[in-house]
Amino acid sequence: MKPFMDADFLLQTDTAKTLYHEAAEKMPIFDYHNHLNPQEILEDRQMENLTRVWLGGDHYKWRAMRAMGFSEDLITGNADDYDKYLAFTETIENAIGNPLYHWTHLELQRYFGITTPLSRATAKELWDEANAKLQTKEFTVRNLILNQHVSHLCTTDDPADDLHCHLALQKEDFACRVLPSFRPDRAVHLEKPDFPEYVEKLAAAAGRTIASAEDMVHALSCRLDFFLYAGCVVSDHSLEGCFYVPCTAAEANDVFENRMNGGALTEKELGMYKGFLLTNLGRLYHKHNIAMQLHIKALRNNSKRMFRALGADTGFDSMNDFAFAPMLGAFLNDMDEDDALPKTVLYSLNPGDNPMLASMAGNFAAPSIRSKVQFGTAWWFNDHKYGMESQLATLSSIGMLSTFIGMLTDSRSFLSFPRHEYFRRILCNQIGNWVENGEYPANLEFLKEMVENISYNNAVSYFL
């Protein structure tokens, strides 16, 4: 029997151990997509206890706790922090096979030096030990980031945000660069009930009137310039349903006007406006050399009752299922036709799309950019051991694993950075298996460089 989560955790071969311990383990982290709060980084917040740092905004954990039958008061409600922690402890003890189990114990090991498994029997001991450390200066938010050697992190920000935290952090002596990501979903999804109110908010931020789809593009261009000033290197889009139907500017303007006047829109009209906006934004991204991330197939807010009670991003989303390959290909080609396609990262929440995305990425290449269109890492419901192995196998079979930009946290927790370690161990194990099966030569120096690139260097070259 192997020891529990020791130094060689997930590393099944000697080659895997060499690649991880001599290459991947030492690399810094470029976390190019997360949902961390920049205000908490600026304030260098000190977390009060394990409950606050673990359960403060993590819907992965909330879903698992609901599956265990705990009341919402113990999950997102006003129950005592220690009672919430005990509920989470019982959840984790029962979470065999779930990545939450591994992530939780990697966090205990890497941040707190705790190797004892979390259980109801050890809960009080671990609570006291971890909380005592959380009160020391080494456990402020910034030090949690530096603990894991994070060189860059990209938060997720609305075009109307003032980015005061990012700008203030640039003036401080903080070794990690905290960069904004441009996420204009509220400008794209005109079917949402609050779209008219958002138009007013964005217009105020941009200092210009928005009375048409073309005006919307100009306002977003203005805000993108500001984001670039604040260090932005990447955008992000959540695409749901029909997101591209070719149309003229006049047709997109008509759809916008109809929506602002309270008219009902067809699925085709939604696709026309979204496609017009997205292709124009893509051209702007290309002009300014920033990457475009496309997160596709999240089916959001399925429990309307809980959405009304708790709002969005609280654990009631799932995978969607619809065909979108022709639409995606046409969308990318629209920009590629006049050589204005930006660097693009493709993600689908449904792993059934993996081969399609891997093959789609290979359609659009450019000199001097390694894998200009990337098949993105296993995302959300797929960023577990088997999901990562599947994504890596599909990418290597259809595309080029060596040019892959690697892992991200996609997290709201400042303890989430060991997820990069989790990915790197799985990566090294996969490559190690190929070598020891005789499928690739044991050129360890070359392979170590490849692992270092996938772990960190490729992301630096791609985004900076």
Residue ranges and their predicted role:
Residues 298, 303:
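Hard-cation-handling environments
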Residues 292-294:
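C-terminal amphipathic alpha-helical interaction region
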Residues 267, 316-322:
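A short acidic, glycine-rich active-site loop
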Residues 1-288, 340-342, 346-358, 362-464:
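Metal-cofactor-binding active-site regions of metalloenzymes
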Residues 331-337:
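Short, basic/hydrophobic alpha-helical segments
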